[in-house]
Amino acid sequence: MHKSLQNIRFSIKPQKEEGDRPVELARSISIHPLTYQELPYDPEYSHYAGRLTTEKLSNASPDEQYWKTKQEIILRHTGEHPYEISGPDALELLQRIFPRDISKVKKGRCSYQFACYHDGGIITDGLLLRIDENCYWFAQADGDMFSWYKANSEGLDVNINEPNVFVSQIQGPKSMELLDHLIDEKVAKEWNYFDWAEVTMAGEKVIVSRTGFTNELGWEIYFRPENNAEMLGDLILNEGSKMGMIITATPSFRGRRIEAGLLSAGQDFTNETNPFTVGLGRFVDLEKENFIGKKALENADKSCRSWGIRIVDGIAKKGRSIKLNDQFIGNITSSTWSPYQVCGVGIALLDTSEIGPGTVVDVECTDEKIHKAELCKLPMYDPEGEIVRGINKRIPTKAEPWVCLLYTSDAADEKYRG
């Protein structure tokens, strides 16, 4: 990449139409019906799964958004893109597409899924909801799954449709309290992680799921065309605001999902990485009958080369910026700052599986300096997922700084050891 582009960020900005010439781009992208809630905060967007995802809002700093997610409650309108797969052969198609056994997904449950090309490279991932006996939604991350369904459905009695459903996430320790307040049914306390249900909110039937992209307690709401999204969205925001809710953008999710080891499609995995390489091998069922990519995955190297990384007093540059003994050994695929751990956090994809957690490396950071960093397991904390399941209800009131025990410079000692 040319050096003049290295520190340039490209974004999509909302533009008010003026004059008699319409802005065609504004209508070539599907807009979340609650985008108007973001407009007062000078939003910037990126293109994501044929939709927009909010990258920046002016109402709170990235650190403030992070702490709202970890201590209180946030609302985020996502770019997730659900497609509907229905018909007598819907299950057969999905069994071809995904490497997990879809027959195990019962109505009322969700399942994390990803699809692979024939060579084992990952297309994208997302959340599969079994809506009915022969009807599924797959709320996908960035990537083209619609064409993949079409290309692999020959000879099957199946419909692949765009249901025009939009997804918002409500995340944080107070999220289930808000849901209990908003819906008529008293199901929130009975729900398990990855359950979904149709509930009544302000007289409307809506689908909500016990899922999210923060690994904090939370839920998602799926706005269907028949829903009054504006009324429901304003209700959620107004009632949530009484609990401290704010609307957030990507920064609120990035830190928590990196700490939790939740991978981002197109960044932490691509069509050039197979599931085993990035630590997703547990979601591949090689005992299952044939699925796309099975042969390649059977023959693939099963070792993991993707790890977390904590950086001393810096934010790692994305790209080929990790060195060990003055030799490049891998890439930073995601990075940000963790206000809770008081260090840079990231996801690293290494060139070899022989290097792993506990290794101290050098990383080029956004301040153009080299910082010490340590590879670690993912998730970085809460390995049993007790926070997202509502088992661990402890809400941190302050930062709990990470200390690189293997790096003992005077500067690190003074700042991190006190």
Residues of each region from the PLM?
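Internal amphipathic helical hairpin motif
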Residues: 88-124, 175-204
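Single conserved hydrophobic/aromatic residue that forms the stacking wall/gate
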Residues: 407-418
